Amino acid sequence: MELIEQVMIFVVILAAIASLVYAWWLRKGVLALPKGTEQMQKVWNGIREGALSYLNRQLKTIIPILAVLSVLLFFTVYITHPERGTLELFGNDPTGIATAQFMVGIGRSVAFILGAGFSLIVGQLGMRIAVESNIRVAQATREGEDRYNRALTISYRGGTFTGMLTDGLGLLGGTVIFIIYGIAAPDALLGFGLGGTLLALFMRVGGGIYTKAADVGADLVGKVEQGLPEDDPRNAAVVA
């Protein structure tokens, strides 16, 4: 590896670490803010319990699927041949090809788990900080002349936390794989990208189902218990 490549890898790792440190700083700043009145916290606790129950149920469902897919991904290297750079690294003879297939299969499966794990961390922590920041945004709008600016700042920090965490973990994972595999990294990075995007898709679909169920439940409560028509603005759940 040439000097310029080593320098650029070092810079990328520093950028990844800086993103993670910035995300931690944003989270710490949000959690240090007041959570509002007792009544606000009572409502917020219900939202928080619902979000955490969804995250825990999602985790129990996803982990077995990831285990099966990681094993299947190992055997994909025997269906499609490794890249040219991989063969240059391990050799183009039968022994080299067999070694390349085995090493790439291992790397692809491990990278898949790594990408899925990073995506899971982002989803879990991102959801939690979103719940934590919501009540603090509501509290910020209740006091002071600059309340809307402060509320917007809290919203920005809560959302940016997830973005910085995604960037930092993505850069860090991709760079580590590149350092280990060198010119054979594209074959292993396939698993890393697939793990991250596949888990994000699962979480996106699962979150949509969960929120739709909450929406239907809120409509039923408004109709049955309060006698309100569907999508009535007097139902707070409709506004939410």
Regions found by a protein language model. Give the residues of each.
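Hydrophobic, small-residue-rich transmembrane alpha-helices and their short perimembrane loops
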Residues: 2-240
